[in-house]
Design a protein with these regions (language model features):
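Cytoplasmic C-terminal tails of single-pass
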Residues: 299-312
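A short, acidic, amphipathic alpha-helical segment used as a generic capping/interface helix at domain edges
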Residues: 75-86
């Protein structure tokens, strides 16, 4: 279990885990199951999501497990049908990617990547999805309006705005406005990355992403029969994640995706240590000592061959 601590210390010494926070929340478990000791150790070290061969469980507000969903990004393996089928089954996409296997570079499927980027997906990461899964709560209600209040991120999550789905049966939503000192912008269908805002989906429902303590008033016309407030996904899109496994060179592996809309959860591994530095000087000394002997041997061998040739 010390490997959990060592992995975290290695990562935090190299880079911030996310734009949302410096501490990592995601940990790759390379087996189909994990006993309670491993999961407890992950929690104790501040990790909040593990995957991606463990069966999914997103019902625990303190720790999630996410299984693979949607296959791979590798050329000849990537499949739009697999992605759609697994989203239908699991409610999200969580694709596998490994840029290099031993000494072989793996090619990504550019056609599938282009297709993915054209879909109504929320491009997110394990930690971001977990951290944003805190819907707003009801603060006040009148005959034709309701005030929602942003809640805090899940225990141990990054400080990110939470996603809420709101609907009102039998009425038509006419206005969504932030009534404290903040500003809440309207989202469009072109927004695929988590940020504060709202989008009216139809006359009776709206999706919102609001930070802790923000006050948002929703107003409608008509007599509301029923009001629903529940956890949503950003912009009402399907969560889409890609996971880079066995990442030994983050810069090199992420470079091909710098212009992509897709967001990766990179499971970083330390680069293999070089052999102790004294070996190189010893090799140099060995080469220096051996070279003159080899040269003398070669000269003697050539002279012998020349003499033998002259005798013939």
């Amino acid at each position: 279990l010390n490997v959990i601590t060592e992995c975290k210390e290695y990562l935090t010494s190299q880079i911030n885990a996310s734009k949302w926070g410096s501490e990592p929340l995601s940990f790759g478990v390379p087996t189909a199951s994990a006993d309670s000791d491993i999961l407890d150790s992950l929690r104790a070290q501040g990790f909040r999501v593990a995957g991606d061969q463990i069966p999914s469980n997103t019902n625990d507000s303190t720790f999630w497990t996410l299984e693979r969903s949607g296959g791979s990004l590798e050329k000849t393996i990537a499949s739009t049908d697999t992605i759609e089928q697994d989203i239908e089954m699991n409610g999200y996409a969580n694709l596998y990617w490994e840029a290099q296997v031993y000494d072989t570079n793996v090619r990504r499927d550019k056609d599938v990547l282009t297709w993915i980027e054209s879909q109504d997906y929320w491009f997110t990461t394990w930690g971001e999805w977990f951290s944003s899964s805190h819907p707003a709560s009801e603060s006040n209600r009148a005959d034709q309006s309701i005030t929602l209040k942003g809640t805090a991120a899940n225990n141990g999550g990054w400080d990110v705005p939470g996603n809420t789905y709101f609907s009102v049966e039998g009425a038509q939503i006419i206005d969504v406005i932030r009534i404290d000192e903040g500003i809440l912008n309207e989202l469009t269908a072109d927004d695929h990355h988590l940020k504060e805002g709202y989008r009216i989906l139809n006359e009776s429902s709206v999706t919102l992403t609001i930070p802790q303590d923000a006050l948002v008033q929703i107003t409608w016309e008509g007599e509301a029969v029923d009001v629903l407030i529940e956890e949503g996904s950003f912009n009402n899109f399907t969560p889409f994640m890609a996971v880079g496994h066995h990442t030994t060179d983050l810069f090199e592996w992420s470079s091909p995706f710098q212009e992509s809309s897709i967001r990766f959860t990179w499971l970083i591994e330390p680069q293999p240590e070089l052999q102790p530095s004294w070996i190189l000087p010893m090799l140099a000394v060995l080469i220096i000592l051996v070279a003159p002997v080899a040269i003398q041997y070669t000269l003697k061998h050539d002279k012998g061959m020349q003499a033998h040739s002259e005798e013939e």
